[in-house]
Amino acid sequence: MTQQYAIDTLLAQAGNRSDERTGAVSAPIFLSTAYGHCGIGESTGFDYTRTKNPTRTVLEETIAKLENGDRGFAFSSGMAAIQVLMTLFTAPDEWIVSSDVYGGTYRLLDFSYKNNNSVKPVYVNTASASAIEAAINPNTKAIFIETPSNPLMEECDVVEIAKLAKKHNLMLIVDNTFLTPVLSRPLDLGADVVIHSGTKYIAGHNDALVGLIVAKGQELCDRIAYIQNGAGAVLSPFDSWLTIRGMKTLSLRMKRHQENAQAIAEFLKAQPQVESVLYPNKGGMLSFRLQDEAWVNTFLKSIKLITFAESLGGTESFITYPATQTHMDIPESERVARGITNTLLRFSVGIEDVEDIKADLLQAFANLK
């Protein structure tokens, strides 16, 4: 019987014993694009690096174990991963999508539907299972949720939504970027597919662009593998290695991100310059609204330790302004109606000393008048 290790152990051991010939503890980087054959029909299991690469395979097998899936797939970005999933469907298929969804996902779905006759996105408050069920029609083929959502941090009941998906024979896709398998395993809750922008917490150091898919079911996995090979938007060997290296400390980092975020959420609630704080009490992401839109630029220019940047999940604290960054492609009236106001800031709380983060926020707030 195979030993079932805890997730902390799986992460710490990622890549170890992956190269039996040398016994390398750190997974080697295989840069070769082609692999020799002994004869017709005789292969080492590797032929061409787009199809399969030894370093990428280590990452794909590791993320599959972490998410309790049947197979993992690594792509050149999170958006490339979503594009591959869209390729599984054809018009007039529809996806029910979280109304509070990452702006890049909105942009891809909107453009592909309007210009490429792709799946039609139907935006729903997926925090409400009844709202999801009310939106299901004969063309609905999948439900796509973020939990917590980006950037309003709304949580979805994956178990209840999975029951709905099964009842109506729909695929349930969960973006698990914010929580990672350390804090949530959607496949165990009934989802069919999990995706990650591995650029964020999984790689964790703001130095690798990564997309990941984990799926259950042989037929579905085979279809994804076929498209991955055909489309070719695969992760490079070096970025695969960076991700493997980064994920070794994922469990430790997530605990510190969460600990700091919980403290910062309480701190922000006590600040008179802050109108509201959005935090689901798990993970390292939160959002907050300033009292006055006119303060936003002054605040962003005033932070010194925290970086004003358009990403999340790294060791460093980042603040993002969704209105002009992540969600700028959503028309303003629609964006504001969804709750992504011009006073909203998204905060990826890093692993620095929490008192230093608080001090930076305080000195920035002091400039708001």
Curated annotation (Swiss-Prot):
Record EC number? 2.5.1.48
Q: Name one GO cellular component term.
A: cytoplasm
Instruction: Recite the UniProt cofactor note for this protein.
Output: Binds 1 pyridoxal phosphate per subunit.
* Matching Pfam families: Cys_Met_Meta_PP (PF01053)
Gene Ontology biological process terms from the UniProt entry: methionine biosynthetic process; transsulfuration
Under SUPFAM superfamilies, the record lists: PLP-dependent transferases
Entry's localization field: Cytoplasm
Provide the GO MF annotations for this entry: carbon-sulfur lyase activity; cystathionine gamma-synthase activity; pyridoxal phosphate binding
What cofactor does its activity depend on?
A: pyridoxal 5'-phosphate
Key word Ion transport present: no
InterPro entries according to UniProt: Cys/Met-Metab_PyrdxlP-dep_enz, Cys_met_metab_PP, PyrdxlP-dep_Trfase, PyrdxlP-dep_Trfase_major, PyrdxlP-dep_Trfase_small
Superkingdom to which the source organism belongs: Bacteria
Keywords assigned: Amino-acid biosynthesis, Cytoplasm, Methionine biosynthesis, Pyridoxal phosphate, Transferase
Q: Which residues carry this modification: N6-(pyridoxal phosphate)lysine?
A: K200
Enzymatic reactions: O-succinyl-L-homoserine + L-cysteine = L,L-cystathionine + succinate + H(+)
Instruction: Give the chief site where it resides.
Output: cytoplasm
Q: How does it assemble?
A: Homotetramer.
What this chain does, per the entry, is described as: Catalyzes the formation of L-cystathionine from O-succinyl-L-homoserine (OSHS) and L-cysteine, via a gamma-replacement reaction. In the absence of thiol, catalyzes gamma-elimination to form 2-oxobutanoate, succinate and ammonia.
Q: Which NCBIfam families match?
A: PRK08247.1 (NF006095)
Instruction: Give the UniProt family note.
Output: Belongs to the trans-sulfuration enzymes family.
The name this protein carries in UniProt is: Cystathionine gamma-synthase
Q: Which organism is it from?
A: Haemophilus influenzae (strain ATCC 51907 / DSM 11121 / KW20 / Rd)
Q: What is the lineage of its organism?
A: Bacteria, Pseudomonadati, Pseudomonadota, Gammaproteobacteria, Pasteurellales
Q: Which gene carries the instructions for this protein? A: metB
